[in-house]
């Protein structure tokens, strides 16, 4: 159970870190609050299978946010360096 706990804490910290650059008005604060609320909703979960499923869902969210950042950076670079013919 302590291994799952450390994985949950690690995922929480990673998602909070990713939330620093979340786009939009009050994006970082809103994203971090939503992550905090989601983790607090499941804080009393004891079933290891359910915890593993929630961890998988959290990892998926992290990958989606990372993809969003990559797309945002790509669009920014393309906009700066595109030639209008």
From Swiss-Prot:
One Gene Ontology biological process: respiratory electron transport chain
Phenotype of gene-disrupted mutants: Lethality during first instar larval development due to reduced lipid reserves and energy output, characterized by decreased ATP production and increased reactive oxygen species (ROS) levels. Metabolic defects trigger defective food-seeking behavior and lethality.
Gene Ontology CC entries for this record: mitochondrion
Tissue: Highly expressed in the larval fat body.
Key words of the record: Mitochondrion
Molecular functions (GO terms): enzyme inhibitor activity
Subcellular localization, as worded in the UniProt entry: Mitochondrion
Recorded family membership: Belongs to the complex I LYR family.
Other remarks on this protein: Was named osi after the Argentinian street language for the football term 'offside'.
Its biological purpose: Acts as a regulator of the electron transfer flavoprotein by promoting the removal of flavin from the ETF holoenzyme. May act with the ETF complex to coordinate lipid homeostasis in the fat body in response to stage-specific demands.
The protein's name in its UniProt record: Electron transfer flavoprotein regulatory factor 1 homolog
